[in-house]
């Protein structure tokens, strides 16, 4: 993806300004079967890799990041850099039934 490094740099720059967790992200993070912490999401944003790019997303250019949280569990974060903050759209634990290659690629349906 030609703009891959550009959007990732924008994500990290926006996160240094401020991070806004959208209601959907908070609901997903607080599910009892997930319990994803803010610290885990921030670690994914700071050190994770971009695995999907959504330049035409209705919410604005966004991307899917993969990183690792507590006990090295895989965490996916969908986020969109804005002018003065990073919007965290959702965060979840990827399902091994839907992902392969270390949770980097979706299985074809």
Where does each model-flagged region fall?
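Ribonuclease/tRNase effector modules and their secretory precursors
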Residues: 1-109
């Amino acid at each position: 993806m030609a703009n891959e490094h550009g959007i990732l740099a924008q994500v990290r720059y926006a996160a240094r300004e401020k991070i806004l967790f959208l209601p959907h992200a908070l609901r997903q993070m607080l599910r009892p079967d997930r319990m994803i912490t803010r610290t885990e999401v921030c670690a994914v944003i700071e050190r994770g890799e971009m695995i999907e790019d959504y330049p035409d997303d209705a919410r604005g250019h966004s991307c899917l990041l993969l990183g690792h949280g507590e006990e090295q569990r895989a965490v996916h974060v969908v986020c969109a850099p804005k002018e003065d903050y990073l919007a965290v759209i959702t965060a979840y634990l990827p399902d091994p039934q839907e992902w392969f290659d270390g949770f980097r690629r979706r299985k074809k349906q």
